[in-house]
């Protein structure tokens, strides 16, 4: 939108609508809630209505809201590439083909607004999600929806980073700025595999996205191994940001002091709200999804 010759910057929140194949198959290694609920009875209709209610609540607050539609499931093309069909697939493969996890919009893409990029356009890179089989075939459907939603010269939509470099999208990316319109600092959080669970975001993928988007004010931060081992399979399970506020657990980052120092140097206005372990343990933070929330600017 243009106001006085200038582009108006609007923050848009996207949610994914759960599909009818929603089920609890326990497919997500490192996601303790997924493992705990494996085999449970899913209620796709109730879940979809909950999601719609949440989106309506955002709209009632005056926020701009978008939606990702459910993808076609089972993914017959993915099964065909593995030499089978839904009727003949082993139960494990069929469960992966039926997954409705594309609803998790935080894993759809990494977004760099125009104020942060060299060419002055908003860049979006669809996440490849290669670490988990049930999510590795989502990107084609997500990319098609991104290209439809952002079919405007003000936006540049990119395909996925190639395997084997894992990219999990916005769940491992944060942006902080004095205001949404101002140039910001983009924070790419990556993991290092070595514990009981895989690190899903690779630093190679994070740096590639930053280069492709033309982002120069970027900080690459390692997620703490302790957080990953405790079940923080994405950074957004232990940290969340909006505008100038960073809300994070004390044990979210491997070198929080260095990260906070670099962040304050680039963005003196930043407000860091850190929750100490003495107040909320990592276990409680992950089980409650305290940080896996949405911060908005009203």
Which residues are covered by each model-predicted region?
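Histidine/cysteine-enriched polar flanking segments
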Residues: 1-298
């Amino acid at each position: 939108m243009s106001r006085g010759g200038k582009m108006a910057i609007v923050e848009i929140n996207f949610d994914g609508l759960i599909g009818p194949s929603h089920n609890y198959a326990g497919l997500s290694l490192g996601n303790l809630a997924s493992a705990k609920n494996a085999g449970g009875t899913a209620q796709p209709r109730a879940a979809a209505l909950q999601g719609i209610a949440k989106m309506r609540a955002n709209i009632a607050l005056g926020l701009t809201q978008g939606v990702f539609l459910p993808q076609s499931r089972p993914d017959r093309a993915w099964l065909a590439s593995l030499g089978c069909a839904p009727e003949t697939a082993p139960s494990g493969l069929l469960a992966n083909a039926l997954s409705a996890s594309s609803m998790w919009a935080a894993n759809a893409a990494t977004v760099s607004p125009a104020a942060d990029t060299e060419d002055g356009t908003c860049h979006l890179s669809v996440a490849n999600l290669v670490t988990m089989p049930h999510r590795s075939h989502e990107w084609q459907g997500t990319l098609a929806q991104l290209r439809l939603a952002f079919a405007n010269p003000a936006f540049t939509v990119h395909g996925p980073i190639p395997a084997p470099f894992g990219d999990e999208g916005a769940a491992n990316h944060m942006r902080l700025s004095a205001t949404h319109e101002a140039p910001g600092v983009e924070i790419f959080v990556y993991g290092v595999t070595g514990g009981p669970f895989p690190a899903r975001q690779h630093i190679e993928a994070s740096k590639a996205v930053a280069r492709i988007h033309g982002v120069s004010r970027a900080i690459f931060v390692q997620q703490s191994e302790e957080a990953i081992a405790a079940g923080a399979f994405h950074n957004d399970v232990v940290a969340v940001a909006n505008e100038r506020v960073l809300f994070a657990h004390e044990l979210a980052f491997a070198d929080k002091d260095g990260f906070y120092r670099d962040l304050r140097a680039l963005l003196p206005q930043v407000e860091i709200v850190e929750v100490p372990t003495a107040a909320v343990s990592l276990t409680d933070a992950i089980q409650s999804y305290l940080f896996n929330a949405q911060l908005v600017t009203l």
